[in-house]
Amino acid sequence: MSLDEFTQLTPDDLISSLDNFQQEIVRTLLKVTNGNYLEVADKWLSASPSNTAKFGGEINRSVLYREKVVDEIEKFLCGNDSTYEEERRKLNIQSDKSQKYIVGVMSTAIGGQLGVAGTFIAPVIVLLVISMGKMCINAWCEMRREIKTKTS
C-alpha cells in the first residue's frame, strides 16, 4: 500500500488501524461530536496533562497543538522537508505495508519530533488523515502550500 492509497482509505479502515482501546474511544467521541474529526483530535490532544506534557494539555490550546501535528504530517507526506526522509524511504521500499504499519511508522516518527509517545499521537494522525477527505497527497500538499503562501 502506498501513502496515497493509505490516505484514500475509508474512515472505518483508518480507525481500525489503531489499537482496540483507541478505536473504542475515537468511535465514542465521534458519536458525541456528530462525526467531527478535528474536534475529536482536539479532545484527544487535551485528554490529560500527564499525557500531553509537551503540549501543555490545555483545552484552549488544542487547535494550536493540532496545527503542529498537521505541520509534521505535511512534512511526512509531502516530503518538503528532510525530517522524515528515512521513514519515507523505508515505506517506499517495504513491499507489504498495511495501514497499521503505516500509522505505526508515522506516529513513531512524528511523536519523536514532537516529544510525545507514538501511541498517544496515532489517533490524532488517523483523524487528521481522515479530515483530508479523499484528496490525493499531491493535491493536499499543494493546498497546504497555498494556505501558507496566503498567510505569510
Which residues are covered by each model-predicted region?
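Membrane-inserting effector segments that mediate pore formation, membrane fusion
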Residues: 84-142
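Cytosolic/matrix-facing juxtamembrane and C-terminal tails of multi-pass cellular membrane proteins
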Residues: 142-152
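Mature extracellular/secreted ectodomains of secretory-pathway proteins
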Residues: 46-102
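Alpha-helical interaction segments
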Residues: 33-34, 55, 66, 130
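N-terminal leader/propeptide segments of preproteins
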Residues: 1-53
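Charged/polar, solvent-exposed surface patches and flexible loops
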Residues: 8, 16, 27-31, 43, ...
